[in-house]
């Protein structure tokens, strides 16, 4: 059943239970009737089987399933303004409930520009951040630079060159 009531919300139900809701601002909710996050797509659930997003690929080749995060410096969709050094391109954000909300930061993985971009040339780095006990924000713990060097708990390179690092 599709309910397009006068409140600007579209609701999809099956077997008498609401399954999907589109809010008047275009946000899509799955598994809940109100949005507690500011994202365009929010999936809510009570167990691991119904509170995730899945991408699967079935093909007889080496191509994977994928998740694409991209960024342009333009404020107009469809315009592709070049990024700058240190621009954050994508982030995986991990949060948890602290008794008052579900927004306390646990950890982040960020992908950022690590140099000067050129035509089909986008130097990148990955950084891994965690929240210490008693803190409310994350701290960078590990960085993989665009040249392959790795920094642990500092922005300074701790190991460079070819070879194997064993800890």
Please tell me what each predicted stretch does.
Residues 1-105, 113-167:
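Trimeric beta-solenoid/beta-helix "fiber body" segments of extracellular/virion adhesins
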């Amino acid at each position: 059943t599709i309910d397009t009531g006068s409140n600007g919300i579209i609701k999809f139900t099956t077997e008498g239970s609401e399954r999907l809701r589109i809010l008047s601002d275009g946000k899509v909710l799955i598994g809940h009737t109100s949005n507690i996050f500011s994202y365009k797509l929010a999936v809510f659930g009570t167990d691991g089987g119904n509170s995730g997003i899945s991408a699967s690929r079935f093909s007889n080749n080496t191509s994977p399933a994928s998740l694409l995060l991209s960024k342009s410096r333009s404020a107009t969709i469809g315009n592709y303004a070049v990024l700058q050094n240190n621009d954050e391109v994508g982030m995986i954000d991990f949060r948890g409930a602290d008794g008052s909300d579900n927004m306390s930061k646990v950890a982040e993985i960020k992908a950022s520009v690590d140099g000067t971009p050129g035509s089909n040339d986008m130097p990148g780095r990955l950084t891994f951040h965690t929240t210490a006990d008693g803190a409310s924000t994350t701290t960078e713990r590990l960085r993989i630079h665009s040249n392959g060097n790795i920094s642990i708990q500092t922005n300074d390179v701790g190991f460079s060159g070819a070879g194997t690092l064993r800890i």
